[in-house]
UniProtKB/Swiss-Prot annotation:
PANTHER family: SIGNAL RECOGNITION PARTICLE RECEPTOR SUBUNIT ALPHA (PTHR43134:SF1). The keyword Endoplasmic reticulum applies. It holds the Pfam family SRP54. CDD domains: longin-like, SRalpha_C. It comes from Saccharomyces cerevisiae (strain ATCC 204508 / S288c) (Baker's yeast). Heterodimer of an alpha and a beta chain. GO terms for cellular component: endoplasmic reticulum; endoplasmic reticulum membrane; membrane; signal recognition particle receptor complex. Keywords: Endoplasmic reticulum, GTP-binding, Membrane, Nucleotide-binding, Phosphoprotein, Receptor. This is Signal recognition particle receptor subunit alpha homolog. It comes from the Eukaryota. Residues 398-620 are annotated as: NG domain. The gene is SRP101. It is a peripheral membrane protein.
């Protein structure tokens, strides 16, 4: 990994500093960099621009330090012109992996810095536009301390989540980033502990090494033998490593002042700034060639009244663009009709073409379709219901039912939802209502074991809690085997009664996957909803399905009878489709049901609230 990151002014004022290994920041490195830059600003400089730099032009310096305590190193840097700031990442040697990591890190730093508008704020302070302090002086950091804290927090999270994990070598570093020497010490300590345990169980003899001819070469000491021991103690550590790989709490979210655990939306900030840049570029380069006629067409024909003939070719082009992004034709037609209703009879703004005006209107229409509530509203609703007690002093649980077609990831996303609820200090009962698919109950049992162990390190996998069920005091599995549709409603009613008696906050019901175009499979959903009466019915739809998502959403929304509809969507596998996010538009267009979360991976923390700006920007790109 790289050594250090620094952001500073030409006068030497350090605005941000970060040491990747958690050591004291080495000012000698930065001083050597500045000295080298002053003495040889051109001849030792190499321009770097590739896919990892994300559009930025970086420069590379190799510094042969004169200080004994600071060996030679490399510095990748970017010079911001207004205001003049240096962004520098130092690293030991030029290797393919280190070069990629430093380039990606510096690009991330600049994107976060720009998205928080820190340069603009510093420039205003330098120009004296902000209020002066008691000494009649404007400090360049005045009024931006909170944004700098945000920058530090966001950078650490995004670096750990998206860059460090990709470049760290598990053979050279431990999980917490320590160097091999400390790892070896810990390993030796564990080996000594293992040795002691073996002696206590009666394995007191030394091991032996055998040659190819069958003769004994020499005796093995206990430490050598312990290295070959893959018994229960080591297998437990392996299972813990496997479990740790299912979660990255730091990347999941932060608690609000009220204690609510919200899904993180740093990507929303980055995409918002990217959207601003894209919009600015589109305004500058609106498709007109740099000819005299193009100039006149752009400037003279602004402020014109739009009619249907003006929009025809533009809307056909926009419709085709939406369809290529997996938006269903009927949804694309609806959106372009909205644009037509919005623009016909209106005038374009000065210096603005009809096409740009139509794109702005389509962006607004997409934003209106995709804008729903956010996760904290759901938390408040749960807390409100749980605050009401009956005459016996008991509270009804808040009940979720998860539905969807086969193979979209219902059980996985139910488990992600369970983890999010557990982080908000709710006690969760997971109910196995998929009594048809072989292995469905066992799959949930594995998830419950994982969640129980994540909430309590002392939980032993395979053990039963004090009520004789899989799980612990935080999360538990309610199961009753396999059977027909009658068993499903019976399990649901029993689980709700059980959760009420045992004071569970949340009931999460996993249901069987079913084809949306098969009435025989869809019809039991109505009786299930009537009997179980869930507070929220969530459909899991996958981003890969494309235009068929319209019919899926309609059929599931209509399956529960009059007066009962879906409440939310979770769109899974959004990390697999790139820019083809049309499924989100299709499902919301077909039903008017909002998207609660999007799934972006297979771990319990790979759940995000929908960033509408990101989705719209992706669809319009």
């Amino acid at each position: 990994m790289f050594d250090q990151l620094a952001v500073f002014t030409p006068q030497g004022q350090v605005l941000y500093q970060y040491n990747c290994l958690g050591k004291k920041f080495s000012e000698i490195q930065i001083n050597s960099f500045i000295s080298q830059l002053i003495t040889s600003p051109v001849t030792r400089k190499e321009s770097v621009a590739n896919a990892n730099t994300d559009g930025f032009d970086f420069n590379l310096l190799t510094i042969n330090s004169e200080h004994k305590n600071s060996p030679s190193f490399n510095a990748l840097f970017y010079l911001n012109k207004q205001p003049e700031l240096y962004f520098v990442v130092t690293f030991a040697e030029q290797t393919l992996e280190l070069n990629q990591e430093t380039q990606q890190t510096l690009a991330l730093v600049l994107k976060l810095w720009n998205s928080l508008h820190l340069s603009e704020s510093i420039l205003k302070n330098r120009q004296g536009q902000n209020e002066k302090n008691k000494h009649n002086y404007v400090d360049i950091l005045q009024g931006i301390e909170d944004d700098l804290k945000k920058f530090e927090q966001y950078f650490r999270i995004k670096y750990e989540e998206s860059i460090k994990q990709d470049h760290i070598n598990p053979d050279n570093f431990t999980k917490n980033g320590s160097v091999p020497q400390s790892h070896n010490k810990n390993t030796k300590k564990k080996l000594r502990d293992t040795k002691g345990k073996k002696q206590s169980t009666g394995n007191v003899g030394s091991g032996r090494k055998w040659g190819r001819d069958g003769g004994m070469l020499d005796e093995m000491n206990h430490e050598d033998a312990a290295k070959l021991d893959f018994s229960s103690s080591n297998s437990h550590n392996s299972s813990q490593v496997a479990l740790d790989s299912t979660i990255n709490k730091d990347s999941f979210g932060d608690r609000t002042e009220g204690g609510d655990f919200l899904i993180k939306e740093i990507d929303d900030l980055l995409s918002s700034h990217k959207d601003e840049i894209t919009s600015g570029n589109e305004a500058k380069n609106s498709g007109y060639v740099s000819t005299a006629f193009g100039f006149l067409q752009k400037h003279v024909l602004g402020n014109k009244t739009i009619n249907e003939s003006d929009l025809k070719s533009v809307l056909e082009k926009l419709t085709q663009q939406l369809i290529t992004k997996n938006v269903a034709p009927e949804a694309a037609d609806y959106l372009t009709q909205q644009v037509s209703h919005d623009l016909v009879g209106s005038k374009t703004a000065n210096w603005t073409s009809v096409e740009n005006t139509a794109r702005e209107s389509l962006t607004k229409a997409l934003t209106q379709i995709l804008t729903p509530g956010v996760s904290v509203d759901l938390l408040r609703e749960i807390q409100s219901k749980r605050s009401k007690k009956d005459e016996e002093g008991k509270c009804d649980p808040y009940v979720f039912s998860i539905v969807g077609v086969n193979g979209v990831g219902k059980s996985t996303n139910l488990s992600k939802l369970a983890f999010w609820l557990l982080q908000n200090n709710f006690k969760v009962l997971i109910v196995a209502c998929d009594t048809f698919r072989s292995g469905a109950v066992e799959q949930l049992r594995v998830h419950v074991e994982n969640l129980a162990q994540l909430m309590d390190d002392s939980h032993v996998r395979g053990s039963k809690n004090k009520r004789g069920k899989t799980g612990n005091d935080y999360v538990e599995l309610f199961e009753a085997g396999y059977g027909g549709s009658d068993l499903v409603t019976k399990i649901a009613k029993q689980a709700i009664k059980y959760s009420r008696d045992q004071n569970f906050d949340i009931v999460l019901m996993d249901t069987a996957g079913r084809r949306h175009n098969d009435p025989t499979l869809m019809s039991p959903l109505k009786s299930f909803a009537d009997q179980a009466k869930p507070d929220k019915i969530i459909m899991v739809g996958e981003a890969l399905v494309g235009t068929d998502s319209v019919q899926q959403a309609k059929n599931f929304n209509d399956a529960f009878g009059k007066g009962r509809n879906l409440d939310f969507f979770i769109i899974s596998k959004c990390d697999t489709v790139g820019e083809m996010l049309g499924t989100m538009v299709n499902m919301v267009y077909a039903t008017g049901i909002p998207i609660l979360f999007v799934g972006v991976g297979q771990t319990y923390t790979d759940l995000r609230t929908l960033s509408v700006k990101w989705a719209v920007n992706t669809l319009m790109s």
